[in-house]
Amino acid sequence: MAKEDIEEEREIRNDASENSSDEEGDDVLDSSEEDDDDDDEEAIKRVREGFIVDDDEDESQKRKRRKHKKRKREERTNDDENNALDQDDLELLMENSGARPQPSSNKLKRLKRAYTEDTEGAEEEEIGAKSGRGGLTDIFSDEDNNEEERADLGETRVDDDRNILDEFEDFIEEDEYSDEDEERQRKLTQQRERAQKKGPRLDTSKLSNVDRESLQQLFEVFGNGAEYEWALEAQEMEDEGNGENLEPTSLDEVFEHAELKERMLTEEDNLIRIVDIPERFQKYRANLNYIDLEGEELKSEQGWVANILFMEKQGSFSGFLEEPFKEAVSKVVEFISKDVYEVPFIWTHRRDFLLYSEEIKNEDGSVTNSVHKLLFEDDLWRIFQLDIEYHSLYEKRVNIEKLIESLNLDDDLVKDVKSLETMVAIQDLQDYINFTYSTEIRKLYDDKETEGIDANITKKHSKYAIFERIKSNVLYDAVNAFGISAKEFGENVQDQSSKKFEVPYRIHATDDHIESPEDLIERLCEDDEVLFKDPKNALNAVRKTFAEEIFHNPKIRHEVRTTFKDFASIRVAVTEKGKAIDNHSPYADIKYAINRSPADLVRNPDVLLRMLEAEAAGLVVVKVETKDYDSWFQCIFNCLKSDGSSEIFEKWNKEREFVLNMAFKRLTSMVSMNTKEDLRRECERLIASEVRRRFLARIDQAPFTPFGFDKGTKPNVLALSFGKGDFDSAVIGAFLRESGKVDEFFKSEDNPIRDRESEDKFSGQLKEFFDKNLRNQKPDVIVVSGYNAISKKLFDSVKSFVETNNVTANTEELTDVQNPPLIQVIWGQSETATLFQNSERARIEFSDKPTLAKYCVGLARYVQSPLLEYLSLGEGILSLTFFEHQKLISTDLVMEAIESAYVDIINMVGVEINEAIRDPYIAQLLPYVAGLGPRKASGLLRNINSKLGSTLANRSDLIENELSTANIFINCSSFLNIPYDEGLSMRDSSVELLDATRIHPEDYDLARKMAADALDLDEEDMAHVEEQGGIIYQLMQDGVNKVDDLNLTAYGKELESKFGKKKYATLQSIKEELVNNFEEIRRSFHILESHEVFHMLTGETTESFTRNTIVPVTVNKVGQNFRDFENSKIKFAKVTTSSFIQGNIEEASIPQGIDLAQGQVVQAVVLDAYYDSFTASFSLLEADIQKGAAPKFHKDPLKWNFEAEQADKQKEMAKERAQLAKTRNIQHPLFHNFSYKQAEEFLAPQAVGDCVLRPSSKGPNYLTVTWKVSNNLFQHLSIQENTQGMGKEYIVEHKKYADLDQLIFQHVQAIAKHVDEMCRHPKFREGTMSEVNEWLESYTKANPKNSAYVFCFDHKAPGWFLLLFKVNVNTPITTWHVKTECDGYRLKGFSYPSMLRLCNGFKQTFKSYVKGIADRSRSTKPAPVNNQAQASTYGGYGY
């Protein structure tokens, strides 16, 4: 689109923007979090807002428009003589002097919640300028108009009295009131009460970038409420008649603010709905004082964004494409920043600016047009992010410029502030100013000579007070004696660095002092006014002062930052705790990482994030250093030292080196942290991008396409599942029609995997279901899924049923289908169904159906619309994992990635707006349409319902009926689909056929012109055809394929040459839409591949379950030759993993002499995995297991610290040898000279309950028995050995045994038996405490009125269990500990011999526990608390 065209469009959309900033201030000083010194900005910001008046803006700033400003509009007064005073000060002076203050021009105060009668006496209400009947127009009108209108209403003076009183009544205490004061107080109180009844006014402090003329346009569109003036007056009279019986008149008085916020009904939410800026833009710019840049400032942003994106794409557009690439980026920046176009709009309707075409002449003389894609949707989102970043940087830089101007600085180091392009560079300059000119800044504040400086500035700069005193003291002569200033030193470093430190000369030479440092300090300390009389303290002060000057010098900082950026080296130092990291740890590959460059970490972003995660856990320390530091430091020092050779000169050089070391110690530490933080942000961004890419693949798929139909047609679906797949599990099914209606449910108690008879019965019942229930409407696809790998058997059974009974695809609506194929049986993606089955949505829709039936509905809905099913999860989608390293970034970043993917796909598909009005399930899509958001979407639906009778007939109605503002209409209109009835033979003139296409209304004339050219119509014919029903209608009647004959390239050239409009891609898009409107352009429905099904049902990936992976397996069957008892060998073994993967162990993979028994758990290594059949082959050979235990990652000799690894191994071995040397041997078959770790490794492949005896670290009179509680869970019990006469006794847990065999049988195995009983109890759940917590939370959310409790292993104390319970959904999870003993269980000091008794005892104990809390509450509170409901609720524990 040509520049003139864009400017014309912008003028039409916002003709009032030119004067938007005439009455606005610019002074908003930044608050950065880069460094401790960043608090300066926060302090400066607070002074600006309340104490000092802004100077007039310069002409360039007056032309800028403000967006999303977060501060109050600056006060303006009518009297020029009062301009020197702040408005608040003026009003305060006038109030104290008894004068009547002039009416406030536009003073706005923060809206506070109005309190009811009960709380009115406790807290003072603040209504301020927001009360009154004038409505929105009064708030935003100019001062003169405001005066007139309020005078007409007869309340100008009263309103201002109320403003002053509200603001200062708590600030000024008067000793006594006169009669007039009391009368005035009474009237003001009445006014406040009247204002409270009217409800709060609109808080315009949140309206950024909205000038008065723009607001006037908004009120013309939405009304100002003046037509209801009579009703408000009548209500007021009625309320006054009722006396004290006041009824609440605002939402704030009826609902809690939290509830209003949840429903998006707060004042801020309404402002977002009103402002003519896309809601997503408002959301991301909320913390910015967003400025509409123009001219050179806009070009600066465009260049900044283009350079960053060009570097990130690593030269993908080098050569002749570099310039077109940067031009495309610049254009997108303009679209986003100035035109407020959202990404989908730019991608769809400004695609010509994202392409570069060139004409290539062929050898035969013909010309080929080659098109290069410069930017993709991911790039547009990145530009959007960079726009936010730049404006944050720009805002901080402008604040620094204002501070420099206020201080009137003449300093070479601050002159180039406009060229600073990084946040750290701006922060470095601010630190320099704060340090160097701290005295001037304090004086500036004290004198109030300028505006925009923070009230807390003196407090902030007190840390520089000592340096200020030294600068003004005789002691500063010693700083000057270093012979070179920090500024000169910085210039030397900058010059030498630019020449790579290869030139011998320097810009500034270092002068040598005639006195030695010691003599000079002693002489200065003799001065009466010297700060430090002690020479040692004085020397330290001098050193620190010069070091601080070097530390704060921006040029020195720039050199350090540049060096770290180019030569940084990241390494890991293992802590004592981190030495426990083994080959199976997620941090194994970073344990001894060294010499990692920033480029290495950016290529593998998860590596740095795992490093930082391990650092946060105290396992490692991540160190960022620079390569060859000593050599680099020497080069820097050469810019500081003198060339003299005397003893005095050497002493001064030593002092200089000492000071430089002091400064560089802080500098490198600071820059190291900055570098680490910058790398972290970049790696998080890359992880988030990968999450977005993976999630896009999930939702970029059309519904499953029925046989014979076009892509995008929704199928009839039959979903089947038997859940866990136990033998007694029923098979449940749900049938969904293409409309989404759940038509039939199926249930068979005959599980087909039980036996052959059950399989036959199941097939017969399913056949009967097809013949009777599905006779009129056959499914187009059968989807099968479940909770685990056993579902593969059901899948095979259903597929066999289809083949055996020749169940063919649905062809009732098709013609000429001779041999229809069999109906397709596919695996269903279960992640959305798993969350749906326990959701509130499922409970409401199918309250009378079992959980598995809801699960089947979720499966079927996914097949009909993956996009809608993911969208329906809401924030629950965060529980799903789309990328293995997703957990390394915050949920906010994950949600942003997911939401951007939603926006892309939903706008690609479009939303049938009238369906969204009728169906909340479809309405979920609307907030993600370009320009809209949850608030604007809800407002749009509400306006359509109220103004148009629940149907939007045309896109143009959005503007004509004032349903949308201009910018929002431009962004969203083409993505709102309004289909027409293709069966009508007559043309309805009220229907715009192009509203059923992706063509934007701005291109409707272009589409009609193309249609006319395709029909060979001239202008007269066009007018006639328009009268007969329209050109588009005529094209559809004659055949849309006629547009295929148009020469779009020539047409595009004509548009560009004559009108300056780039429309090549737009023309092609219009042509496609005319031929096939809103065609399904998503990818086809993705049928899960074998490895995806394997991961879905087992939780294993192709990386976690592959060759040489060690896994525990349970022996199901052992094949052995029992005829030869002496030499019998195990021929084979059938095994199963915990995830129900079936496996075989052949004879060659079984060690000789091993004894295997059914039910035994052994450690095995995977030889081959067959993902499609959920089977694998395993080996038990020691050599294979050792191979599987080896590290799975490559150790680069240049990037792995082998020396440290070997040293740690040697220390560990020496420690173990020393431990073994202290131990003794006893004669017992279970005794082994093991350490605790060796004992655990030995027991790992053994059965649960097996144990070993081993030496104890307590001494020779002790032993330790280690027994296997569960997989990877072992309990170590200390045994005390006492000699009693001729025999011995063994004491464990205060129980005595005569020998070790008795101890093992009566104590260890008894405990193991109770552990096994616990694990078999239905209230027990496997998994970590966090996993069990998640299950308990989700269960109580699904059953909010039920109580629930559950047992799980205490992984921190093996042999103990955790009892977790929730009284109801609103109470926190409480955890009690249960100890397993040889004679039962112990809970809260009580013993229970069985699980039944334990559960009953827990319930009784809990009731006593609740009663005790209630009794204590009664004794401490004046009013009794009724806990009876809580106690009685915890009666049933079923789930």
Swiss-Prot record:
<dbReference type="GO" id="GO:0000122">
    <property type="term" value="P:negative regulation of transcription by RNA polymerase II"/>
</dbReference>
<dbReference type="InterPro" id="IPR041692">
    <property type="entry name" value="HHH_9"/>
</dbReference>
<dbReference type="InterPro" id="IPR042066">
    <property type="entry name" value="Spt6_death-like"/>
</dbReference>
<keyword id="KW-0158">Chromosome</keyword>
<dbReference type="Pfam" id="PF14639">
    <property type="entry name" value="YqgF"/>
</dbReference>
<dbReference type="InterPro" id="IPR028088">
    <property type="entry name" value="Spt6_HTH_DNA-bd_dom"/>
</dbReference>
<dbReference type="GO" id="GO:0016973">
    <property type="term" value="P:poly(A)+ mRNA export from nucleus"/>
</dbReference>
<dbReference type="GO" id="GO:0001073">
    <property type="term" value="F:transcription antitermination factor activity, DNA binding"/>
</dbReference>
<dbReference type="InterPro" id="IPR023323">
    <property type="entry name" value="Tex-like_dom_sf"/>
</dbReference>
<dbReference type="InterPro" id="IPR049540">
    <property type="entry name" value="Spt6-like_S1"/>
</dbReference>
<dbReference type="Pfam" id="PF17674">
    <property type="entry name" value="HHH_9"/>
</dbReference>
<dbReference type="GO" id="GO:0006334">
    <property type="term" value="P:nucleosome assembly"/>
</dbReference>
<dbReference type="GO" id="GO:0042393">
    <property type="term" value="F:histone binding"/>
</dbReference>
<dbReference type="Pfam" id="PF14632">
    <property type="entry name" value="SPT6_acidic"/>
</dbReference>
<feature type="compositionally biased region" description="Basic and acidic residues">
    <location>
        <begin position="151"/>
        <end position="165"/>
    </location>
</feature>
<dbReference type="InterPro" id="IPR012337">
    <property type="entry name" value="RNaseH-like_sf"/>
</dbReference>
<feature type="compositionally biased region" description="Acidic residues">
    <location>
        <begin position="140"/>
        <end position="150"/>
    </location>
</feature>
<dbReference type="InterPro" id="IPR017072">
    <property type="entry name" value="TF_Spt6"/>
</dbReference>
<dbReference type="InterPro" id="IPR010994">
    <property type="entry name" value="RuvA_2-like"/>
</dbReference>
<dbReference type="InterPro" id="IPR037027">
    <property type="entry name" value="YqgF/RNaseH-like_dom_sf"/>
</dbReference>
<protein>
    <recommendedName>
        <fullName>Transcription elongation factor SPT6</fullName>
    </recommendedName>
</protein>
<dbReference type="Pfam" id="PF14635">
    <property type="entry name" value="HHH_7"/>
</dbReference>
<feature type="domain" description="SH2">
    <location>
        <begin position="1229"/>
        <end position="1323"/>
    </location>
</feature>
<dbReference type="GO" id="GO:0033554">
    <property type="term" value="P:cellular response to stress"/>
</dbReference>
<dbReference type="InterPro" id="IPR035420">
    <property type="entry name" value="Spt6_SH2"/>
</dbReference>
<dbReference type="Pfam" id="PF21710">
    <property type="entry name" value="Spt6_S1"/>
</dbReference>
<feature type="region of interest" description="Disordered">
    <location>
        <begin position="1"/>
        <end position="206"/>
    </location>
</feature>
<dbReference type="GO" id="GO:0000791">
    <property type="term" value="C:euchromatin"/>
</dbReference>
<dbReference type="GO" id="GO:0005721">
    <property type="term" value="C:pericentric heterochromatin"/>
</dbReference>
<comment type="function">
    <text>Histone H3-H4 chaperone that plays a role in maintenance of chromatin structure during RNA polymerase II transcription elongation thereby repressing transcription initiation from cryptic promoters. Mediates the reassembly of nucleosomes onto the promoters of at least a selected set of genes during repression; the nucleosome reassembly is essential for transcriptional repression. Essential for viability.</text>
</comment>
<dbReference type="InterPro" id="IPR028083">
    <property type="entry name" value="Spt6_acidic_N_dom"/>
</dbReference>
<keyword id="KW-0727">SH2 domain</keyword>
<feature type="region of interest" description="Disordered">
    <location>
        <begin position="1417"/>
        <end position="1439"/>
    </location>
</feature>
<feature type="compositionally biased region" description="Acidic residues">
    <location>
        <begin position="166"/>
        <end position="182"/>
    </location>
</feature>
<feature type="compositionally biased region" description="Basic residues">
    <location>
        <begin position="62"/>
        <end position="73"/>
    </location>
</feature>
<keyword id="KW-0804">Transcription</keyword>
<dbReference type="GO" id="GO:0031491">
    <property type="term" value="F:nucleosome binding"/>
</dbReference>
<keyword id="KW-0539">Nucleus</keyword>
<feature type="compositionally biased region" description="Acidic residues">
    <location>
        <begin position="20"/>
        <end position="42"/>
    </location>
</feature>
<dbReference type="InterPro" id="IPR032706">
    <property type="entry name" value="Spt6_HHH"/>
</dbReference>
<dbReference type="Pfam" id="PF14641">
    <property type="entry name" value="HTH_44"/>
</dbReference>
<dbReference type="InterPro" id="IPR000980">
    <property type="entry name" value="SH2"/>
</dbReference>
